[in-house]
Amino acid sequence: MKGTYIYKQNGIEIGRSENVITTDGKKSILQYLAGTNPDWASHMVIGSINTAATTSDKTLYYEVARSPINLKSFSSTSPNLIVKSTFEPYFAANIYEVGIYPASNSATFGVRNDLIINDFSLQSAWTDSGSAITGQWTEYLAQSPTSPRIGMYSLTVPSNKTYTNSSTYFDLRSYTTVDTLDLLLGPITTTSDPKNFTVKFTNSAGDYASLVYSLSANVNWQVKSLALTSDILNLKSISQIDITTASGLTVKIDAMKINIAAEVDETNSLVSRSIPTTPIAKIYGAPLEIEYYLDLQ
């Protein structure tokens, strides 16, 4: 079996990429063909990290959006199975990984889902001691290696600095301590390694709890993860986020999300994962169509 993703914006092809069909994916496809699995392609997903695809992949490395499959067809000539999904217009991303899941998160985990807490698209939401943050934003630019990979902006937090977002709201009551808070980070500079980066959550009652990430100098994009603690989950609903760098640490942050990937098993893990040679630009205001062609020969 082999597969190909084709990317279209406004009906025009803007790229294509070959894929790796995972070990679990082959099982899902064969079980579907045998009638023992209700579906093999339920949702298309896009992400931000271009680590090489392998047959053991169970999730994208940093999923930023998923969309239901809205068209399925069959061809008697190669390729045999064709599916299509359309991502809604109103977000921006540079896509470095793409995949297919056999089941939706809602079918597997109920109300729980990956949750993008913040992608730094709204500059006015973040302040420096109550004042607007200036000179620290990087604006989205299609396919640029320095551009945000999700959202309209990324934010550079300089040494010994706290930035605050007090106009946020999200609910943690459906999550558990096996879930993680994943940070999508760009270049990191330090005076010595490692340095602490603190994410503090506060609820409307003024109760708070923090996660402290240990960061080292790095020129590449990466994901840093820490498990949610009971103290954070006990806050229930979050109304403020503070992010703080230690002295000697400067870090670019692009997104924060809660990840439920630890609970993914072979019945709901990735069928296929692909790394485009050139990142695919998802332009704000334009839907993105992704077609997947699976050759069963």
What are these model-derived regions, one by one?
Residues 111-263:
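Beta-rich carbohydrate-recognition modules and glycan-binding surfaces
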Residues 1-96, 101-118, 130-132, 143-153, ...:
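Small cysteine-rich, disulfide-bonded extracellular modules of the LU/uPAR three-finger superfamily
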